[in-house]
């Protein structure tokens, strides 16, 4: 279980020399291991008060609990961010790495370079517009095998309260993680369908009566409309196309979500980190895919997918 592990200290960044060329014997390797353990032992006593991580940014992974646990995962390490609330974090971008082709070209959208955004099956239009899914018809968009894998599995249409009630769609396997990523403090399933196309069709019908957007500023300020999602669920039932009514989830319950936030921003101000830009701030909370810092600064971590980040944490 992830939260049982402590973040790893990057010993090769603490000792400023080419460690790999230095290691010529097993004895020297053992010495370096002892030094790494020594630094880890000293850190709780504030004798070592900084940690360094670097890697390709992907969206934060989460663990559903009484309070959501957040993790930043890199290739050789990960950060349990909850441990570092109210501590100083510095981030700088030192390049790009496309999530599809791994090129160093600037990121265009969604973690992809421009070429991959328009060509990779990972960025097909049906991802944003589920009603365009065609795998159930055995018709390819960009890669039929991949599209079948994603589209031809159970999907859920839901209502979530991210400040106001909105309708959305996700794969069944992504419940409740999709709601966490949106910063919803509560959510409920409406219908469950066997594929993405049917769920997308239902969502299109519901969008005529309900919003499908999140007001990110309202969500981050924790301004929440006092609503009854069970009542909204029953109302939504009347908007579902008749050929999909039998997919209605009669027994679904409201799921409550609590985020690790010490202080919400009054006037959230979005921070963008591009190549050679550095940002520092005291971490005050995490909600959705946002890091909340002091002075109303917020960082949409997922919006930086494909960026190469150096992250330093000072306790």
Show which residues each predicted segment covers.
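Hydrophobic alpha-helical segments, principally membrane-spanning helices and signal/leader peptides
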Residues: 1-3, 28, 146, 270
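Cationic, low-complexity basic patches in intrinsically disordered or flexible, solvent-exposed regions
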Residues: 3, 7-9, 17, 28-29
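Cysteine-centered motifs
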Residues: 37-40
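Non-catalytic accessory segments flanking enzymatic or RNA/DNA-binding domains
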Residues: 45-315
């Amino acid at each position: 279980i992830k939260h049982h592990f402590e973040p790893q200290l990057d010993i090769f960044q603490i000792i400023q020399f080419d460690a790999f060329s230095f290691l010529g014997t097993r004895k020297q390797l053992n010495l370096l291991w002892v030094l790494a353990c020594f630094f880890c032992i000293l850190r709780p006593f504030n004798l070592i008060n900084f940690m360094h991580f670097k890697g390709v940014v992907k969206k934060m992974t989460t663990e559903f609990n009484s309070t959501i646990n957040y993790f930043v995962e890199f290739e050789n390490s990960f950060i349990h961010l909850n441990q570092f609330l109210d501590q100083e974090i510095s981030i700088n971008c030192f390049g790009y790495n496309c999530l599809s082709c791994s090129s160093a070209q600037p990121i265009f959208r969604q973690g992809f370079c421009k070429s991959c955004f328009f060509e990779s099956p990972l960025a097909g239009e049906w991802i944003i517009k589920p009603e365009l899914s065609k795998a159930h018809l055995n018709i390819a968009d960009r890669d039929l095998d991949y599209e079948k894998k994603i589209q031809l599995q159970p999907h859920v249409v839901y209502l979530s309260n991210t400040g106001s009630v909105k309708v959305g769609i996700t794969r069944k396997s992504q419940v409740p993680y999709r709601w966490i990523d949106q910063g919803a403090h509560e959510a409920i399933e409406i219908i469950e369908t066997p594929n993405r196309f049917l769920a997308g069709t239902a969502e299109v019908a519901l969008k005529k009566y309900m919003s499908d957007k999140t007001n990110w500023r309202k969500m981050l300020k924790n301004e929440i409309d006092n609503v009854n999602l069970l009542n909204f669920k029953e109302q939504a039932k009347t908007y579902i196309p008749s050929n999909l009514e039998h997919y209605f989830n009669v027994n679904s319950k409201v799921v409550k979500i609590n985020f690790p936030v010490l202080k919400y921003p009054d006037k959230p101000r979005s921070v963008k980190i591009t190549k050679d830009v550095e940002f520092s701030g005291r971490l005050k909370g995490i909600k959705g895919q946002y890091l909340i810092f002091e002075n109303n600064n917020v960082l949409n971590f997922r919006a930086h997918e494909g960026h190469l980040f150096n992250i330093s944490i000072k306790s």
